Amino acid sequence: MAAEQFDDFDSFPNLVTMFFVRARYRGDAPFLWAKHDGAWQSLSWAEVARQVAGFAKSLRQLGLEKGDRVMLVSENRPEWCIADLGIMAAGCVTVPTYVTNTERDHQHILDDSAARAVIVSTAKLAKTLMPAALRSSQAEFIIAMEPQPAVQHGQLSMHQWSDMVQGNDADVRAAEAAMAAVTRDDLACIIYTSGTGGAPRGVMQHHGAILHNVDGAAEVLREDFGLDEEEVFLSFLPLSHA
């Protein structure tokens, strides 16, 4: 597939289809990087696609359905991107939150979004999240990216990230086929404000609107800066803000 075909963002029905098409084209090329023990390590496009598909499959096996909200509490890391894409690949809606949120902020967002599942990265972030999740009338599942200390989890069902991202090429094909039911008018995510002016407010973003932004950003990077697909970008601003 020619790289030029990726300039036509209007042809994609949703963000996940765009990703899977891109992953097929890029294959084993590095996609996401993170530093571990002082050394940079990468995940390829193909491996990320398998993890995204595996995570989507696991969410559906938990009983999550199209339109269900999944809250994401994590610092910038490759798992953040995989979680976001996997949530949308399951037909669900990502609810990203700031790592600086207070317990009260988490409580408000959980109640306002009616999130059925919550993904949390570290034990430190879980300290402010768990009390709010335990009080939530809608939350059912906690998915931990890293091992968590033994804490009271009440009615919440606890799951480990590593168990939920086991996917293969067949899962990728199934996930891509399932995305035919998701259109540009479907909700992709609900981004909450920081709450500095009161309670955080959710802004609904649909697949089509984000694809339009992707199209505009790609044009600027390509025409104004002369960047191509081999460029490496450092993620500095919180992904939850984007």
Residue locations for each model-derived region?
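Conserved pre-ATP/AMP-binding loop-to-beta segment of ANL
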Residues: 27-30, 144, 159, 169-192, ...
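AMP-dependent adenylate-forming
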Residues: 18-43, 150
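ANL superfamily adenylate-forming
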Residues: 126-184
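Conserved ATP-dependent adenylate/AMP-binding module captured primarily in the ANL superfamily
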Residues: 99-131, 213-234
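Conserved AMP-binding/adenylate-forming core of the ANL superfamily
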Residues: 31-85, 102-107, 160-165, 207-208
